[in-house]
C-alpha cells in the first residue's frame, strides 16, 4: 500500500522548495546592457549563498511541526532524518522556561552489572531545546556499560562531571518549574532529589496513555509509536531524544493533562 502525503505536508514541501529556486532571466540596465543577477553570478562562480540548514531527527521534526502548527499526522510518513530550513532563531525558545522534561541513562554496577548507576542526565525545555546534557561519573566501578541500550561508553567519562555536580545543577534547574518525565521517579531517585507532586507531569501515569497497555505502565517507545507515529530507541537510547519524546507527548495533551492535575488536587468540599 502506497503512503500518501497529506495536503498540509505537500503545501509545506512546496513552500520549502520555492525558497531554493533561482530565477535566471536577464535584466536590462538603463544603458541597454544586460545585467547579471547576483544569484546567477554566484552560481557561475560556484559561490554558495550562506543558508543555514539543520538535520532533524523524527523527534526534532515532530517538535518543529508542533511549534509551527502542523499536525503530527502530516509527518507520520517520515521515518528517516530529513533536512529542513529552520524557522527563525527565537532566543526565548531556547531558555529553560516553565516546563522541563528530564531523562537519564544508566550503566551497570555491582556483581554482573545488575545494579544501576546514573551515567547521563538530559533536560530539554518546552520546545525541545537541550538546556542540560551531561555525562556523569558513576560513584561505583562500572561492570557493565550497557552501551547497546544506554549509548554510554567509557570514552564519555573523559567529559563527565561528578555526581555531586550533576545533582546540584539539576536541582537548580528544576526548582520552581514543572517537571515532565516518563516514570520520572526513577530519575529523581537516581539523583537523590525530590520534586513537588503538583509540579510533576508523568506520561507513564496519564490514564489515556495507560489505556493502550490495558491500564499497565506503557513504555515510552510504545507511546511514541502509538500517539506520535514515531519510532524511537531504534538502537541505543538517547536521553535527549527520550526527553524530547516525553515533552512532545505532554504537549499534545497538555490541556487534558493540566485538567487532570487540577481535578486530583481539588479538595472535596466539607459537608456540614
Curated annotation (Swiss-Prot):
The keyword Protein biosynthesis does not apply. Keywords: Exonuclease, Hydrolase, Nuclease, Nucleus, rRNA processing. Residues 99-250 form the Exonuclease domain. Signal peptide: none annotated. Residues 1-33 are annotated as: Disordered. Pfam families: RNase_T. The keyword Nuclease applies. Its main location: nucleus. SUPFAM superfamilies: Ribonuclease H-like. Its EC number is 3.1.-.-. Residues 1-17 have a biased composition (Low complexity). GO terms for cellular component: nucleus. It is found in: Nucleus. GO terms for biological process: ribosomal large subunit assembly; rRNA processing. CDD domains: REX4_like (cd06144). Exoribonuclease involved in ribosome biosynthesis. Involved in the processing of ITS1, the internal transcribed spacer localized between the 18S and 5.8S rRNAs. Belongs to the REXO4 family. This is RNA exonuclease 4. It comes from Debaryomyces hansenii (strain ATCC 36239 / CBS 767 / BCRC 21394 / JCM 1990 / NBRC 0083 / IGC 2968).
Amino acid at each position: 500500500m502506497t503512503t500518501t502525503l497529506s495536503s498540509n505536508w505537500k503545501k509545506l514541501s512546496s513552500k520549502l522548495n520555492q525558497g531554493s529556486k533561482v530565477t535566471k532571466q536577464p535584466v536590462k540596465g538603463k544603458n541597454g546592457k544586460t545585467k547579471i543577477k547576483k544569484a546567477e553570478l554566484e552560481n557561475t562562480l560556484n559561490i554558495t549563498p550562506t543558508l543555514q540548514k539543520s538535520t532533524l531527527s523524527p523527534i526534532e521534526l515532530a517538535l518543529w511541526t508542533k511549534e509551527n502548527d502542523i499536525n503530527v499526522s502530516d509527518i507520520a510518513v517520515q521515518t528517516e532524518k530529513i533536512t529542513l530550513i529552520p524557522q527563525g532563531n527565537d532566543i526565548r525558545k531556547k531558555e529553560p522556561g516553565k516546563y522541563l522534561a528530564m531523562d537519564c541513562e544508566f550503566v551497570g554496577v555491582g556483581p554482573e552489572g545488575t545494579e544501576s548507576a546514573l551515567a547521563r542526565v538530559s533536560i530539554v525545555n518546552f520546545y525541545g531545546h537541550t538546556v542540560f546534557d551531561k555525562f556523569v561519573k558513576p560513584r561505583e566501578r562500572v561492570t557493565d556499560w550497557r552501551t547497546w541500550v544506554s549509548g554510554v561508553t567509557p570514552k564519555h567519562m573523559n567529559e563527565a562531571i561528578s555526581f555531586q555536580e550533576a545533582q546540584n545543577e539539576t536541582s537548580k534547574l528544576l526548582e520552581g518549574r514543572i517537571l515532565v518525565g516518563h516514570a520520572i521517579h526513577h530519575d529523581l531517585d537516581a539523583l537523590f532529589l525530590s520534586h513537588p507532586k503538583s509540579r510533576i507531569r508523568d506520561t507513564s501515569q496519564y490514564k489515556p496513555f495507560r489505556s493502550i497497555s490495558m491500564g499497565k505502565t506503557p513504555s515510552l517507545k510504545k507511546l511514541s509509536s502509538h500517539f506520535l507515529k514515531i519510532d524511537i530507541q531504534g538502537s541505543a537510547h538517547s536521553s535527549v531524544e527520550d526527553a524530547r519524546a516525553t515533552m512532545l507527548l505532554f504537549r499534545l495533551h497538555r490541556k487534558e493533562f493540566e485538567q487532570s492535575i487540577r481535578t486530583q488536587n481539588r479538595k472535596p468540599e466539607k459537608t456540614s
